């Protein structure tokens, strides 16, 4: 889990646009962020397996 200070820091508008970075709103993880869904890979997997993401299915071939 990310520190609360880092979560708050990421939400603030930076002085320069290039300093902005994505962070998972659920757990605060800055890496492995999926832009399409707006969450990190770990939270994505948990939500997908729980059926909370519409249109997402486990791959099978």
Curated annotation (Swiss-Prot):
Organism the protein comes from: Maridesulfovibrio salexigens (strain ATCC 14822 / DSM 2638 / NCIMB 8403 / VKM B-1763) (Desulfovibrio salexigens)
Record carries keyword Membrane: no
Similarity remark: Belongs to the universal ribosomal protein uS14 family. Zinc-binding uS14 subfamily.
NCBIfam families attached to this UniProt entry: PRK08061.1
Cofactor note: Binds 1 zinc ion per subunit.
Domain of life from the UniProt record: Bacteria
Entry-linked InterPro entries: Ribosomal_uS14 (IPR001209), Ribosomal_uS14_bact (IPR023053), Ribosomal_uS14_sf (IPR043140)
Annotated function: Binds 16S rRNA, required for the assembly of 30S particles and may also be responsible for determining the conformation of the 16S rRNA at the A site.
Taxonomic lineage: Bacteria, Pseudomonadati, Thermodesulfobacteriota, Desulfovibrionia, Desulfovibrionales
HAMAP family (UniProt xref): Ribosomal_uS14_2_B (MF_01364_B)
Keywords: Metal-binding, Ribonucleoprotein, Ribosomal protein, RNA-binding, rRNA-binding, Zinc
Gene (UniProt): rpsZ
Gene3D superfamilies found in the cross-reference section: 30s Ribosomal Protein S14, Chain N
GO cellular component: cytoplasm; small ribosomal subunit
Positions annotated to bind Zn(2+): 24, 27, 40, 43
Molecular function terms from GO: rRNA binding; structural constituent of ribosome; zinc ion binding
Coiled coil ranges: none
Protein name: Small ribosomal subunit protein uS14
